[in-house]
């Protein structure tokens, strides 16, 4: 029996496009893709808006094949506490730069404290327009370069501001393989050699979770080697054009040990989002 496949990039929103709002169609397409369980989350540009309505609608969709992430205003940590207390949602999606605030900003201190205390998974996704450079409007660079770069800058800000040191038990998932953050680990470590406090950057980076939406087998292999198989989650970016229709294929192309592959294609997501799931539930029926 193969490992259960769980993809977390199933963006769900009440929009005009059927791909965004028709759960039956979403599950049909995931059947064709070989995905057993989907994780639905808000469209990033709606994060923090109509919080209660979105969270209630998403929670109502939760079931055997559907796990959900909600949304909150990160400057109102009481929203996260209330959402997690409800119990139907195990985490939230936030923009990489919510309301123009980078993730290490003191204004978000309460949010990170609440996220650690409640055990919430915090999925960080770029806003798709994080940089106003005119060149980003050319050649689809706002997406191919701008999106991962936005995540990179804000995650580096989170690390450099000491948030990961203050809250070592945070569960933070970075979209698109963490952007280019892993490739910058040497530069970030060098900066800590010349400036206090001299933290272990490599160890801090390995506290992040990253997804598999990198579109390159060798890039994904590097992520698994650096972060470890227990920190990489399967993603699809469904139904967007830069997503992948068969998300598990790139993982299986790595020819990893079966236990490591099982973690990436489903086990890690279930551990974070469905902690009551028994081990045998993590295998395909």
Which role fits each region the language model picked out?
Residues 132-138, 178-193, 220-226, 242-253:
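Histidine/acidic-residue-rich catalytic or RNA/ligand-binding cores of hydrolases
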Residues 97, 127-128, 159, 178, ...:
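Catalytic metal-binding/acid-base residues of hydrolase active sites
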Residues 1-37, 170, 214-233, 240-285:
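Mid-to-C-terminal alpha-helical segments outside catalytic/metal-binding sites
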Residues 1-20, 130-151, 188-207:
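Active-site gating loops and adjacent loop-to-helix segments of metal-dependent hydrolytic enzymes
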Residues 30, 38, 58, 68, ...:
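Divalent metal-coordination and catalytic microenvironments
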Residues 36-154:
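Active-site gating/metal-coordination segments in enzymes
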Residues 162, 166-203:
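Aromatic-lined glycan-binding groove of carbohydrate-active enzymes
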């Amino acid at each position: 029996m193969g490992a259960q496949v769980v993809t977390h990039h199933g963006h769900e929103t009440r929009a005009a496009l059927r791909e965004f709002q028709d759960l039956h169609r979403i599950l049909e397409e995931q059947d064709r893709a070989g995905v057993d369980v989907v994780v639905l989350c808000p469209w990033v540009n709606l994060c923090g808006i109509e919080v209660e309505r979105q969270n209630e609608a998403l929670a109502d969709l939760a079931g055997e094949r559907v796990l959900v992430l909600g949304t909150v205003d990160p400057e109102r940590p009481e929203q996260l506490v209330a959402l997690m207390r409800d119990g139907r949602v195990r985490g939230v999606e936030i923009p990489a730069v919510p309301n123009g605030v980078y993730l290490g900003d003191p204004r978000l201190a309460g949010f990170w404290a609440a996220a650690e205390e409640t055990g919430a998974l915090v999925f960080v996704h770029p806003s798709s327009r994080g940089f106003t450079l005119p060149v980003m409007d050319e050649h689809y660079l706002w997406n191919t370069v701008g999106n991962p770069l936005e995540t990179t800058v804000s995650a580096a800000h989170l690390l450099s501001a000491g948030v990961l040191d203050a809250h070592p038990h945070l569960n933070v998932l970075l979209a698109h393989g963490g952007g280019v953050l892993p490739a910058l680990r040497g530069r970030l470590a060098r900066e800590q050699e010349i400036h206090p406090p001299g933290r272990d950057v490599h160890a801090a980076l390995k506290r992040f979770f990253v997804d598999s939406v990198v579109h390159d087998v060798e890039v994904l292999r590097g992520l698994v080697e650096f972060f470890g198989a227990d920190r990489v989650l399967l993603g699809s970016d469904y139904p967007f054009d830069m997503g992948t229709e068969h998300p598990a294929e790139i993982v299986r192309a790595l020819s990893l040990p079966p236990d490591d592959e099982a973690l990436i294609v489903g086990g890690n997501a279930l551990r974070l989002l469905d902690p009551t799931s028994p081990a045998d539930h993590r295998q395909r029926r």
